[in-house]
Amino acid sequence: MKTGRMQKPGRVAMKNARDFLIVTNNPLLAQCMEDCYELSFFPDCSYREILVKVRDLVYVGHTLYTHPLSGSVKPNETPYKSIAVSKVPHAFSAEQAGIIAECILAADKFPPRTRALSEAVKRDFQLIDYTLLAGALEFDAAAGLSKIKNHE
């Protein structure tokens, strides 16, 4: 349906898993979804660096399928971020570029995290990021988690 207006990120009708790409730094998400979706996994990137990578994709015409600041966890609280974008670039959208640029500016307003996170807290933040994206994609989060539990 072409109306000349962008649908809100997260509201874009996704045809199937082959239509989009997940950009993430979340190792839990990468493990759970690697067999179902195409991933660009950047384990050493920060939350902000993931936003910048997505911005670069949007600038060449990729479409945001999930909102870059989804969820209620502040950017300075969690190190993990996962965003779904179109797998194939289309025409550049100034509206999409504006959304991701504003998200980067919003993330920059928060002071950087200075305290180290325990492994348990990191796992919790990984799970939060994973379940947010799984919900947006209507992915069976429990099945993904059981897949990795069965391989341990």
Spans of features found by a protein language model:
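Short, polar loop motifs at secondary-structure junctions
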Residues: 23-30
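Rossmann-like NAD(P)(H) cofactor-binding subdomain of soluble oxidoreductases
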Residues: 33-78
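Short basic, glycine-rich beta-strand/loop surfaces that mediate nucleic-acid
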Residues: 76-90
